[in-house]
Each structure stands twice: as structure tokens, then as C-alpha cells.
């Protein structure tokens, strides 16, 4: 077995310890994801002459981060945890980073829940600061997949969201079973590939909202494919017709993107 196959046995998901708290590589990658997304946003604002100031953009990212964290955590609890009743009757436990007195961080986030939180935060922000909603969402469509790359690499380094069992030569040994490095597949397809397509397509954009609608379609297609290599969520398994919860939610998001595209295109005024 090569060093790559056995990488988890030679790699510590904890990067370092600071004042008694373990700092995981996932946390570092999460911060890199945020900073890279914000950096990309500022680049496209200047490059494409998008009418929003740096100060307002920084403020917007603060709003979005709150929405994403709330949506991702609540979405995970409601859909994946299997303990929704407990958490919603003990709300102080939702963001409790301690378990039996030990700091373990906040575990369990849902991408699709994050999308809901992101959209609500963006809508509220645009109403308060009188911004063009669809123009701002198009900007986010370029930044999200760029930051997403680091997020999925973080999942890989954190040794979570394992792939399905396989015999391919690049599989990763997880507790004695060779598995697909599905987190890296997702970083490549749902992150890098989607970003590159939108990056080059943005110059051909015909109406505000086109990029975010296209992002929804591209992301869900990539996620649907990657889910075939990813182990279904524990406690949920396959939902129907051999499809995972991630695939079911992606189907809904796909049609949401299609409907948004044709609605915006129909109402576009040249």
C-alpha cells in the first residue's frame, strides 16, 4: 500500500494546539475558503465594474457568514442528525462546542441548509442597503465555488465525509477499507470545474441572475455525480431508487435553478 493510500495513518487532522484548544486543519481551510471567496469578490467587483464599495462588500460577507453558519447547522440538525427533537428542545446545545467538558468544536453542517441561510441573509441585506439582489447573487455565483474548493479539501484533511468502498489505485485507507477520496472529487467538480465555467461564461451574461441560476444547475449536476462515490450519510442511507439525501436535495435545487433562469430571462428588459 502506497503512502497516498495510507495517508490518514500518517496525517493528524489537528494542525496545532493553542491554549489547550485543538486547531484542526478543517478550521484553517474554512478560514481560507472565506478569505478566498472575499478576495475573489473584490477582484470581480473591480474587474467587472460592479457597483458596490469595499466597505459594503465586507459588511455583506459578515451578514452572509452569519446566515451560512445558522442555515448549515440548523439544516444538518433538521435533515441529517436524527436528533432534531432533542436539539430544538435544547436549543443551547445547537452551537455548544463542548462535549463532556472537552472542546470538540461544532460538528455537523449541511451545504443545502447553508444555501437557505445564504439566500435569506442576502435578501435581507439587499432590502436594508437597497442593493440589486440578482446582481449581488451573480457575484456570489463566482465566489462560492472558488471558496468551496478549500472547504472540501478541509473535509478531506479532517478525515470526514468518506467515499464509498473501492479498489481503484488512488483509494484512501479508512479504518482498513479502501475508499474513494470523494471530498477531492467534490473539490474538483463542484468547486474548480464550476468556477472555471462561470468565470469564462460571465462575459456572455445577458441578464442579472443568470450566473446564480447557472451555478445552481452546474453545482447540483456535479454534486449528483459525486454522490455516487460518496458514502451515504450515517443513519439515513439511501432514500429512494438508490439515491442519497444529497442527491434528492440536489434535484430540488436543480429545478429551482432552471425555474429561476427562465423566470428571470422572461422578465428581462433589454
UniProtKB/Swiss-Prot annotation:
Q: What is its main location?
A: membrane
Report which gene this protein is encoded by. lgt
Record carries keyword Transmembrane helix: yes
Tell me what topology the record assigns in the membrane: Multi-pass membrane protein
**Upper taxonomic lineage:** Bacteria, Pseudomonadati, Campylobacterota, Epsilonproteobacteria, Campylobacterales
Highest rank taxon of the organism: Bacteria
User: What's in the keyword line of the UniProt record?
Assistant: Cell inner membrane, Cell membrane, Membrane, Transferase, Transmembrane, Transmembrane helix
InterPro entries on file: Lgt
State the name under which the record lists this protein: Phosphatidylglycerol--prolipoprotein diacylglyceryl transferase
Indicate the family of this protein: Belongs to the Lgt family.
Q: What does this protein do?
A: Catalyzes the transfer of the diacylglyceryl group from phosphatidylglycerol to the sulfhydryl group of the N-terminal cysteine of a prolipoprotein, the first step in the formation of mature lipoproteins.
Listed GO CC annotations? plasma membrane
Chain sites annotated for binding a 1,2-diacyl-sn-glycero-3-phospho-(1'-sn-glycerol): 152
Q: In which pathway does it act?
A: Protein modification; lipoprotein biosynthesis (diacylglyceryl transfer)
GO MF terms on file? phosphatidylglycerol-prolipoprotein diacylglyceryl transferase activity
Cellular localisation: Cell inner membrane
EC number per UniProt: 2.5.1.145
Q: What sections of the protein cross the membrane?
A: 14-34, 60-80, 103-123, 133-153, 181-201, 209-229, 235-255
Which BP terms in the Gene Ontology apply to this protein?
Answer: lipoprotein biosynthetic process
Name any one Pfam family assigned in the record.
LGT
Amino acid at each position: 500500500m502506497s503512502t497516498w493510500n495510507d495517508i490518514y495513518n500518517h496525517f493528524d487532522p489537528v494542525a496545532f494546539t493553542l491554549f489547550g484548544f485543538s486547531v484542526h486543519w478543517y478550521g484553517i481551510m474554512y478560514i481560507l475558503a472565506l478569505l478566498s471567496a472575499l478576495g475573489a469578490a473584490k477582484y470581480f467587483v473591480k474587474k467587472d465594474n460592479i457597483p458596490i464599495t469595499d466597505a459594503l462588500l465586507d459588511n455583506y460577507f459578515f451578514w452572509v457568514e452569519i446566515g451560512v453558519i445558522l442555515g448549515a447547522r440548523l439544516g444538518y440538525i433538521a435533515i441529517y442528525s436524527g436528533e432534531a427533537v432533542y436539539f430544538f428542545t435544547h436549543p443551547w446545545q445547537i452551537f455548544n462546542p463542548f462535549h463532556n467538558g472537552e472542546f470538540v468544536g461544532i460538528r455537523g453542517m449541511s451545504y443545502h441548509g447553508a444555501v437557505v441561510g445564504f439566500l435569506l441573509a442576502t435578501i435581507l441585506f439587499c432590502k436594508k442597503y437597497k442593493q440589486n439582489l440578482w446582481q449581488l447573487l451573480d457575484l456570489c455565483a463566482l465566489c462560492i465555488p472558488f471558496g468551496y474548493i478549500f472547504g472540501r479539501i478541509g473535509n478531506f484533511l479532517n478525515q470526514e465525509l468518506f467515499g464509498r468502498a473501492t479498489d481503484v489505485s488512488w483509494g484512501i485507507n479508512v479504518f482498513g477499507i479502501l475508499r474513494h477520496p470523494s471530498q477531492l472529487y467534490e473539490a474538483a467538480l463542484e468547486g474548480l470545474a464550476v468556477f472555471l465555467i462561470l468565470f469564462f461564461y460571465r462575459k456572455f451574461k445577458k441578464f442579472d441572475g443568470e450566473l446564480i441560476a447557472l451555478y445552481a444547475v452546474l453545482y447540483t449536476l456535479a454534486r449528483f455525480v459525486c454522490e455516487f462515490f460518496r458514502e451515504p450519510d450515517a443513519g439515513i442511507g439511501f432514500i429512494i431508487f438508490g439515491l442519497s439525501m444529497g442527491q434528492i436535495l440536489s434535484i430540488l435545487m436543480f429545478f429551482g435553478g432552471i425555474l429561476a433562469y427562465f423566470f428571470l430571462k422572461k422578465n428581462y428588459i433589454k
